[in-house]
Amino acid sequence: MGPQLVDYLLYEKEDNGILWIKFNRPEKMNALYGTAESSGTVAKVGEYMRAADDDPEVRVVVLTGVGRGFCSGADLKE
């Protein structure tokens, strides 16, 4: 079973074993959303990584950002 997906973090697995985890808030330079608890970006990255670790088809995980920035850090306005 895979992770519970959210809009602000993409989980895209290719047939060749590459898993892309993408920060998806380009309008905020992919700032981290929420808190470290269950719904925040950091918690979700952990959930996605655990799902990748449990999936024997995943050979490598690429962590990247949508748009021109990887991640600007915590969203202080949230």
Label the model's feature ranges.
Residues 1-66:
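Conserved CoA-thioester-binding segment of acyl-CoA-metabolizing enzymes
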Residues 68-78:
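Amphipathic alpha-helical interaction surfaces in cytosolic regulatory modules
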